[in-house]
Structures are given as structure tokens and as C-alpha cells.
Curated annotation (Swiss-Prot):
Gene Ontology CC annotation, any one: membrane
Tissue: Expressed specifically in anthers.
Annotated protein name in UniProt: Sugar transport protein MST8
Cytoplasmic side: 1-17, 103-116, 161-166, 223-294, 342-347, 407-425, 472-512
UniProt-listed PANTHER family: SOLUTE CARRIER FAMILY 2, FACILITATED GLUCOSE TRANSPORTER, SUGAR TRANSPORT PROTEIN MST8
Localisation per UniProt entry: Membrane
Record's bilayer topology term: Multi-pass membrane protein
Gene3D superfamilies named among the record's database cross-references: MFS general substrate transporter like domains
Gene name in the database record: MST8
Summary of the function given for this chain in its UniProt record: Mediates active uptake of hexoses by sugar:proton symport. May play an important role in transporting monosaccharides during anther development.
């Protein structure tokens, strides 16, 4: 298989010389700041849409409907296509932008893509903070989406290529950790800006998105590019020097040879999109489609960017709903550290399976709690004790996602693709992630209105399906060098029919023409 490496017939993977260096740690820390812009937007959008001053200015019909329905159906009071378009337009823009980002990443490197994403996101943040009408608001959201699309396409690849194999999981998950930090920061900012007299706090919330954008863009100016990217652009001497620097040793011959072989195979590919559709890459194609799709079908982004609206819907006051969102943001961030500490020791499959089971139970219990209190009529006065139980249940769900499908939904796809299809395949990951984020964001409030408490059962059923998918179809990838990843498919009971059983034994490096 193109981009493969020599592996022993017993399937033991190579252990390249090298160590974790301060240089790699700092580079990955700076690159992972790309997650801040994504996380900040997830957290900020739901908060401002629960602020009365924001609704009065841009969505007066939603505000009027909210006030009219205090004693009626709580499920439907925020159902507005225009309001959901404000939230979801970003993800549609990110979807389209990621396709263009693939070309930029391949031709100019991961660093340039991250820099461009940060600058475009910065412009969008300024427009949103200064918005005078809905059109200006949506245009700003679209620019934010382009920035997110560029960032999400390049950052996971950068982290996976810079990290040594035995620590790839931990370093790659720093991207998801930064997403959770962004969400928490946004929730805290919303809580305090909602208290600003004069009704302009939402401008501060939206405008402060410029801060993570500046961090990402500024940091990208000082980042080195990865050896993989340098080789694919014909910079052999720079690539070898960079590999020595990031591994902290001069003994990089075996790893460098494998990278060169992968690069030669990559250069032989004229159209990586067409190559991705070839039968031998069927496992990677399926994973690049289903993992991001299933990640969004957990319902996590519904909880995170609609958390204040959701809490308000089930009876919390405005300030209480924002504080509840802060609590879930804290849980989200701290639970991510569990994944960082265990992913390279326990492996990807165990975390995904255990997290899936926990999410299933949490969703069904949450649906039952809301069903008992609100029924199908959506009318109830929720007590403080009952509200606490609901928040605890949501926290159980969020924590499960944060140490499983949250970080691993980005990690696993970024580490399984050979170099010749890596940029294109990562764009597919981002496209499907953003597509289903857009779809769910656009229809969530309508689904809540029509399915009522059944919406949580729907997401629970999706989590049952995805847990089964991991159990049967996802092989373990921990500790395997990124350019040797092809061998796991040849040893898998199902995928070996596409790549050939020989891929699990000794694999000769070949190029595709």
C-alpha cells in the first residue's frame, strides 16, 4: 500500500528513536490554540441567543414568543428558523471552507492554513461585535465559519504529524482540550456580560471572539511546519533537520526513510480525492465519513451551544441558565484531562466504548426526567431539586463525551490516513462534522418542539448504534507510527477484504501511479 512502511510479519510496529522535546510540546500547544476559536463560538452562540437584549434587537418575534409562552408549551418557545440560521450558518461556511483548505494545506503547509484561518476568524469577530442588523450578523458568522473550517482541517493533522507515536494521542487531544477551554471561557463571559446595563453585553461576548483569533494567528507566525509537509513540498533537507529537532536525536534514519517513502507515494497521486475513493482506501473513507457524523449525532453540540436555551426551556431563569452552562463547560474541560491521561495507555477503543455506554444511559435517563415533568404538553414548574438532578444528568453525559468521542472523534481520523490522501481525507472529516453540526443546529429547536422529550431518546439510540460500530469495525491505533497505520486494516476481520490480508504482515512500500 502506498505510504506504508516495512512491518514485521508478526505485526509488531516500529519504535523509532527519539523523545518528547520541549520544542514539540510548545509547538503542539500553540497549534492546539486553533481549538479555542471553535470552542469559543460553540459556547458563545447559545449564550447570546438567550439574552433578551440580543433577541429584542435581531429576533424580536422570538422574544415576543418567549414572553407569551411562559405558561404554555416550553418545548416550542424558541422554535425559529432565522434564529437557528444565526447559529448554524457558521458550520455551513466551515464545511465549504474545509474543501479549499485541503488544497492550501497540501501545497503550502499546515502552518499557512492555520494562519489564514485565524485572520479570517478575526474579521468575522469584529463584524459580529459591531453588527447593526441580521445580515451583518450572518456575514460575520460565515467568516467565522471559514476560519473554523481552515483550523479544523489543519490543526489535527499538524498535531498528529509532530507528535511521537507513543504520545500522539495525548498531544492531539490538546486540540479538543482547547475547544473545551474556549467553551468554558465563552460561558463565563456570557454569564457576566448578561449583567451589563444598557443591553449591549452581547456585543462584548461576540467581539471577544477576536482574542482566540489573535492567539491562533499570532502563534502560527512562529510555528515550524511538519517534516511530512516539508517533504511533500520537496524540502528534503529542511524536513530531515526538522525531524532531528522534534525528535531530539540525530538517529532519525528509519523514520525519515518511511516519511520519504510516504512522500514519494504522495507525489505520485495526481488527484487525492479520486484516490480516496479507491477500494484499498475503503476503511479510511468509511472512518472519515462515519466518525465525525456519529460524533455529532451524540447530540453534544446541541447541549453545548444551546445549553442556556435548553436550560431556559426546562424552567431555569435567564441567569440560572447561563450559570448552568458554565457548570457543564467546567465538566467538559476537566473530563477531557481524563482522556489526555489515559488515551495512550488504555487505547482509543476502550475509551470510545466506555464513553458510549455512559452517554446512552445519560440520554435515556435525561429523556425520562423531562418526560415525567413536562410530558407531551410541555407545561410544568420545575423545582430547584429537580433542576439540579437534570443538570447532574447532563453533566454525566458531557463528561462521557469529553473523555471519549469528543477528543477521539478528531484524533482517530487524523492518525489513520496515509500521506497521499491525508489532506483530502481530513477535509472529508471536517465536511461531515460541519455538515451534521449544521443540520442538527438548524433543526434542533424544531425537533425539540415536535419530538419533545423523545429527542433525548433519539440521541440515545444514535449512541447505541455508534458504540456498536466501534466494537465491530474500529481497530486499535494506539502506539502505531502514523506512516505504518496501514497494517491495522489488513489484520481486521472485516477491512482485510478491501486492503488484503497481507497488509497485516510484511508490507513493501510501493507508490501508486
Amino acid at each position: 500500500m502506498a505510504g506504508g512502511a516495512m512491518t514485521d510479519t508478526d505485526g509488531a510496529h516500529k519504535n523509532y528513536p527519539g523523545k518528547m522535546t520541549i520544542f514539540v510540546f510548545l509547538a503542539c500547544l500553540v497549534a492546539s490554540s486553533g481549538g479555542l476559536i471553535f470552542g469559543y463560538d460553540i459556547g458563545i452562540s447559545g449564550g447570546v441567543t438567550s439574552m433578551d437584549s440580543f433577541l429584542i434587537k435581531f429576533f424580536p418575534s422570538v422574544y415576543a414568543k418567549e414572553k407569551e409562552m411562559v405558561e404554555t408549551n416550553q418545548y416550542c418557545k424558541f422554535d425559529s428558523e432565522l434564529l437557528t440560521l444565526f447559529t448554524s450558518s457558521l458550520y455551513l461556511a466551515a464545511l465549504i471552507a474545509s474543501l479549499f483548505a485541503s488544497v492550501i494545506t497540501r501545497k503550502f503547509g499546515r502552518r499557512i492554513t492555520m494562519l489564514g484561518g485565524g485572520v479570517i476568524f478575526l474579521v468575522g469577530a469584529i463584524l459580529n461585535g459591531a453588527a447593526a442588523d441580521v445580515a451583518m450578523l450572518i456575514i460575520g458568522r460565515i467568516l467565522l465559519g471559514i476560519g473554523v473550517g481552515f483550523s479544523n482541517q489543519a490543526v489535527p493533522l499538524y498535531l498528529s504529524e509532530m507528535a511521537p507515536a507513543r504520545m500522539r494521542g495525548m498531544l492531539n487531544i490538546s486540540f479538543q482540550l482547547m475547544i473545551t477551554v474556549g467553551i468554558l471561557a465563552a460561558n463565563l463571559i456570557n454569564y457576566f456580560t448578561d449583567k451589563i446595563a444598557g443591553g449591549w453585553g452581547w456585543r462584548v461576548s461576540l467581539g471577544l471572539a477576536a482574542v482566540p483569533a489573535v492567539i491562533m494567528a499570532g502563534g502560527s507566525l512562529f510555528l515550524p511546519d511538519t517534516p511530512n509537509s516539508l517533504l511533500s513540498r520537496g524540502k528534503e533537507n529542511e524536513a530531515r533537520a526538522m525531524l532531528r529537532r522534534i525528535r531530539g536525536t540525530d538517529d532519525v534514519g528509519p523514520e525519515y526513510d518511511d516519511l520519504v517513502a510516504a512522500s514519494e507515494a504522495s507525489k505520485a497521486i495526481e488527484n487525492p480525492w479520486r484516490t480516496l475513493l479507491e477500494r484499498r482506501y475503503r476503511p479510511q473513507l468509511v472512518m472519515s465519513v462515519l466518525i465525525p457524523t456519529l460524533q455529532q449525532l451524540t447530540g453534544i453540540n446541541v447541549v453545548m451551544f444551546y445549553a442556556p436555551v435548553l436550560f431556559k426551556t426546562i424552567g431555569f431563569g435567564g441567569t440560572a441558565s447561563l450559570m448552568s452552562a458554565v457548570i457543564t463547560g467546567l465538566v467538559n474541560m476537566f473530563a477531557t484531562f481524563v482522556s489526555i491521561a489515559t488515551v495512550d495507555r488504555l487505547g482509543r477503543r476502550k475509551l470510545l466504548l466506555q464513553g458510549g455506554v455512559q452517554m446512552i444511559f445519560a440520554q435515556f435517563i435525561l429523556g425520562t426526567l423531562i418526560a415525567v415533568k413536562f410530558g407531551t404538553a410541555g407545561v410544568a414548574n420545575i423545582s430547584r431539586g429537580y433542576a439540579i438532578v437534570v443538570v447532574l444528568c447532563i453533566c454525566v453525559f458531557v463528561s462521557a463525551f469529553a473523555w471519549s468521542w469528543g477528543p477521539l472523534g478528531w484524533l482517530v481520523p487524523s492518525e489513520i490516513f496515509p500521506l497521499e490522501i491525508r489532506s483530502a481525507a481530513q477535509s472529508v472529516v471536517v465536511v461531515f462534522n460541519m455538515a451534521f453540526t449544521f443540520i442538527i443546529a438548524q433543526i434542533f429547536l424544531m425537533m425539540l418542539c415536535h419530538l419533545k422529550f423523545g429527542l433525548f431518546y433519539f440521541f440515545g439510540a444514535m449512541e447505541l448504534i455508534m458504540t456498536g460500530f466501534v466494537f465491530f469495525f474500529l481497530p486499535e491505533t494506539k502506539g502505531i507510527p502514523i506512516e505504518e497505520m496501514d497494517r491495522i486494516w489488513g489484520k481486521h476481520w472485516y477491512w482485510r477484504r478491501f486492503v488484503g490480508a497481507g497488509a497485516g504482515g510484511k508490507v513493501e512500500i510501493t507508490s501508486t501511479v
